[in-house]
Amino acid sequence: MDWALILAWGIKILSLFFVILTGVAYYTLAERKFAGFIQDRPGPNRAGPFGIFQPLADGIKFIAKEEIFPKNVSKGMYLLAPTISMTCAIMAWAVIPFGGTLPAPEWLTTLTGVATIDLQIANPDSGVLYMLAISSLSVYGIMIAGWSSNNKYSLLGGVRSTAQMISYELPMGLSIVAIVIMTGSLKLTDISDSQKDMWNILSPPGFVAFFIYVTAMFAETNRLPFDLAEAESELVVGFHTEYGAFKFALFFLAEYMNMITMSCLTTLLFFGGYNVPFQLGAGSEYQAFIGLGFFILKVLFFAFLFIWVRWTLPRFRYDQLMKLGWKKMIPWGLFVVMFASIYTVYWKEGWMKLFI
């Protein structure tokens, strides 16, 4: 029985890994296509019909390129940096619930004895804390990359990115704390299930927390208008200036993986997660499939938002970035935590009725 469970978990993990890599590959293609649309050009259209094999061609190119190591680099740390970034990006997916419970296929039930499949690898009681911890650890990969490359542009990019991510983790954490106060749980499934009747963004504290969270989300993923770590006009390509071939591909994959992860987290925290509007399909055997479909649609919207903002807004100056984080975002984050506390007491206990 134990071996059967291990096999079932292995199949689930490998399936998720395949879906993640495929999704990230075609997310890069979608961004290049949208960039072409914005710039009035067709975008990638040579590798297969409509360019659908472009991600495969890019993958072969990265793998086939020669691995070059700059002189005087700390080789062990130099190789460790992209590994840390990629590992953290993958580990974050372990606690994301993509839907409810699906009936297992007959062949899987026969093979392992498992009758149902939870659309989540693990469901710890502190799923939100796990996500925040993993996002904090990813800073090490960027800082080590900047330091170990023995390049001034890389080092400046690493220092910038570290300061930026630490600065914006605080308001992001405060906005998430507001949601935790309102829902009363750190489990992502509980937070999603608590929004069956009303999404968190429709509540006054949730509405304010959403805008704080989304702003911090762009800074955390080093995307425009907050891509100060990779400012091409200033730092070549920032902390991965000295990286090429497969090592650069790991950083590239980690960045796009983090964008999709943040889109999933936004959906779970503010937009009901996998819950279906108006309880469509409630009680049917297809409810989990319907929930998964709605979850994917919500995630695709926020994934598109990353692309849209990149080709719409200009880059901040570094001093403006720091000023926004410490003088605006953190005070607003503290305010929304207090606001959520007062709102939750009123909503659950009705104490404010005493004063009306």
Curated annotation (Swiss-Prot):
One annotated GO molecular function: NADH dehydrogenase activity
Membrane topology note: Multi-pass membrane protein
Subcellular location: Cell inner membrane
GO terms classed as biological process: aerobic respiration
Complex formation: NDH-1 is composed of 14 different subunits. Subunits NuoA, H, J, K, L, M, N constitute the membrane sector of the complex.
Database matches in HAMAP family: NDH1_NuoH (MF_01350)
Function: NDH-1 shuttles electrons from NADH, via FMN and iron-sulfur (Fe-S) centers, to quinones in the respiratory chain. The immediate electron acceptor for the enzyme in this species is believed to be ubiquinone. Couples the redox reaction to proton translocation (for every two electrons transferred, four hydrogen ions are translocated across the cytoplasmic membrane), and thus conserves the redox energy in a proton gradient. This subunit may bind ubiquinone.
Identification of the protein by name: NADH-quinone oxidoreductase subunit H
Taxonomic lineage: Bacteria, Pseudomonadati, Spirochaetota, Spirochaetia, Leptospirales
Gene: nuoH
